[in-house]
Amino acid sequence: RQRQMCIRDRLGRIHSIDDAKTSVERAKSAGFNNISLDLMMGIPNQTIESLEKSISFCADCKVTHISSYILKIEENTPFYKVQNKLKLADDDMQAEMYLRAVEMLDSLGYKQYEISNFAKQGYESRHNTNYWRCGEYIGIGPSAHSFFEGKRFFYSRSMDDFNNNKLSFEGTGGDEEEFIMLSLRLKSGLNYSEFEEKFGYTLPPYIIKKAKEYEKYGYTFLETAQDLSLIHISEPTR
């Protein structure tokens, strides 16, 4: 418990373990039956043992969904300024943590349906799945981002700009490469028919060829059943 609190403190979080548990209990009392928790890995001085305790805590809260992410140091953040002083997990340790998380979450009934997301059966995030399927969405309010009719745009965080209806455009999105990349993040994989329906032509042969090459090394596997053809990323293994 003390180690968990130290990890929390290193992240600059002010809530306690009890606060987190109370928040979940209050959400349930308010009538929410689909609750998700975020699980972080690769935190300074984190160990496999402390990660396992965090996973057990999430499961003990009896939530229906868990998102698990590896710490990434972004520019213009407090961690970025002191990253040379941080004892961060190397790539091998991060991989070990990820594999252990996948293994343990599965044993607790949280099935992986996307690279970083796990859920009890029937509780996969419809909101995020829409992003991974290149679906459209409209953001409302300052700083809100949207993707509509092939264009990405967002409102300024400034209330004045928002009130003046000022939009900033990020460019286009939802193209073939993005669709393929996001589909491969999903357990369900890249569906040939969905690609053809969305873009009006069949999946380029070079994509299938490349997937077959990776299949030899165990990185991908191709599945064909009746009229269904899929490309999947292989299960993570040590």
How would you label these PLM feature ranges?
Residues R1-Q4, R8-Y201:
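C-terminal scaffold of the Radical SAM
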Residues L108-G109, E213-Y217:
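Short secondary-structure junctions
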Residues Y201-E213:
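Short amphipathic alpha-helical interaction segments
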Residues K216-T224:
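A short, conserved structural fragment
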Residues D227-L230:
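Minor-groove-contacting beta-hairpin "wing" of winged helix-turn-helix DNA-binding domains
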Residues I233-T237:
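A short, hydrophobic C-terminal helix/tail in secreted or cell-surface proteins
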